[in-house]
Structure formats: C-alpha cells, structure tokens
Amino acid sequence: MKKQAVLSLSGGMDSSTVLLHLLANDYQVTALSFDYGQKHNVELERAAELIEYLNKNGHHVKYQRITLQGLVGLLDSNLVKGGDDVPEGHYEEDNMKDTVVPNRNKIFSSIIQAVALSIAQVRECDVDIAMGIHAGDHAIYPDCRQEFRDADYEAFKQGNWDADKVKYITPYLYGDKF
C-alpha cells in the first residue's frame, strides 16, 4: 500500500509544490481546499486545474473543495469578502497583518486532522498531514509557527484515539520563498 497523505491545498505555490513532492515520493494524496469567502478565488481555481491535470496524466489525487462560506461576515480580515482592500506589495508585517484570518489554520487543521484520522482508521495505516506553511509567514501569521503546530498537534493527540497514526509534514517550515 502507498503511503497516505492529506494535504491542505490552497492552489498557491507553496501547497502546490508540496503536492508534487508527495507524489514524487509515492504518496496517495487526498487534497483539501477551503473556500472560506476569500477574495482571491483564483488560487482555488488553480488548485482544481492542477488536480485535473495531474489526474489526466497518470496520478490519482482525491480532491475535495470544502465550503466554509458560512464564515463570511463573521471573520474580520481584509482577505475575506466584505473586508477592506487586500494590501499589495512585499510581505511587510505592518500591512500584511490586515490579511490575518482569525484562527484560519486551526479551522483547516481540525478538518484535515479528522480526515487523516478517518483514513488511518479505515485503512489501518499511518497518515501524514502535509502543509505548505513557510518561514516567511511566521512574523505575520502566528498559526504558521512551529509552536502553534506543536500545540495544535498535542491537542489533536489528547482529543482522539489512534492520533499517533497521524503525523505532520511541513517541508518549508524553516525555509523562505526568497
């Protein structure tokens, strides 16, 4: 049986390259994208296009776009419809803090963890959770830091039977885009 992974796939550069890395390392991947009312839907479109391309070219990636549209209007962020304009330019801490979506990666992680644990239990195997978070996000997004990932994983293990069958892969956690 192939190694199993559940990937948070935004459709951006980071998570897309993690997907390719997983496939190159012989993983069976379940990719999840989240539609939470973000203004830049182009990444979700790119995620679907990438999955379609890969599946037409010899890979088999299970893909699910999960809608969290009910959160629109409840979350305060410039990234979400109804918020102010999205800041442009380089990742500068002052202007990029407006792009923080409260608890976004925790919301995503809870869903991804549940899917990974379900796969582990049904297939009686270990499952890796893969994310494209990287060091360039640490100053801006607290939920992209190792300390957050560790605490979140510990809570997951405390709250679920067989959680030791699920591990994290974050290949870019200490790397930067530049």
Which stretches of residues belong to each language-model region?
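ATP-dependent adenylation/nucleotidyltransferase module used to activate substrates
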Residues: 1-178
